[in-house]
């Protein structure tokens, strides 16, 4: 904790470790305090939902569970890459370490 999190919401990422290794998805949410991300459709867990009223149905839902940021890599145009920063027109922008393109 305390490091800069280089992954942002809506980034395409590749899972590099764990049961979903090799799969890709978009980041739904970044949990900075615990260094984890929620990736759409990956690391699914079953969650029990209580019935709240007579019409409302309870049951078992599948929801995304957080993945540690060390287990994902941002996808550039040519594949997974590390992220660097560069100043362009007085603004700090994220760049692909492999190709130098702006992310």
Swiss-Prot record:
Alphabetized InterPro entries for the sequence: KOW, Rib_uL2_dom2, Ribosomal_uL24, Ribosomal_uL24_CS, Ribosomal_uL24_KOW, Translation_prot_SH3-like_sf
The organism's place on the tree of life at top rank: Bacteria
Keyword Kinase: no
Biological process annotations from GO: translation
UniProt-listed Pfam families: KOW, ribosomal_L24
Family, as annotated: Belongs to the universal ribosomal protein uL24 family.
Entry protein name: Large ribosomal subunit protein uL24
Protein species of origin: Treponema pallidum (strain Nichols)
Name of the coding gene: rplX
């Amino acid at each position: 904790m305390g490091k800069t999190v280089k992954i942002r919401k809506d980034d395409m990422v590749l899972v590099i470790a764990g049961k979903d290794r090799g799969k890709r998805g978009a980041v739904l949410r970044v949990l900075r305090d615990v260094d984890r991300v929620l990736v759409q459709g990956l690391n699914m867990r079953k969650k029990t939902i209580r019935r709240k009223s007579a019409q409302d149905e309870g049951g078992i839902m599948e929801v995304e569970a957080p993945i540690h940021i060390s287990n994902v890599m941002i996808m550039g145009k040519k594949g997974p890459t590390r992220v660097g920063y560069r100043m362009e027109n007085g603004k700090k922008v994220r760049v692909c370490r492999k190709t130098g393109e702006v992310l």
